[in-house]
Amino acid sequence: LDRSSAASDVYKRQMLRRSLAGDQVERISGIVNGTTNFILDAMESTGASYDEALAEATRLGYAEADPTADVEGHDAASKAAIMASLGFHTRVKFEDVHCEGITKVTAADIAAANDAGYSIKLLAICERLQREDGSEAVNARVHPTLVPKEHPLASVSESYNAIFVEAEAAGSLMFYGNG
């Protein structure tokens, strides 16, 4: 973990802990891994294959020599567990987060999504759910997601990260920065 990534994660935690402390967060969705966002963005903007985009990410230093934790979604799942724990004032463990990576996303998938008005982004999604008995639960998951082009997260490019928060009093907020 490099210093810029660690600093970015600390900032995100502080944002959730302090900025929204008095508010009830309903949903947090975000692009929380710069490597996977770079790969998916390169596939969309240049038509590159997954392997070509990964090679470029490695060449530029965005991907590590072993990118498994990034491309399989494990890094994003760890961050989703932290976001859910902080945002919903509960304990969510890494093992509780459903996780799918981007290794099966093809250039054809990207093109079809683009033609339909979507971008594919690896999103960490954490949300408050109401059970039938009236109790609440928190769901956290990471997977490639079709994001409508008009949604702010669709415009997050290269290795940038963004967190989109939906809260009761604050409404919709987006926090954007280097991954």
What positions do the PLM features span?
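Conserved anion/nucleotide-ligand pocket segment
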Residues: 17-72, 76-78, 83
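Structured core elements
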Residues: 27, 39, 121-122, 141, ...
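A broadly conserved detector of short glycine/acidic/proline-rich loop/turn motifs that flank catalytic sites
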Residues: 44, 124-126, 146, 169, ...
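C-terminal helical cap and adjacent loop that interface with cofactors, partners, or active-site loops
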Residues: 157-179
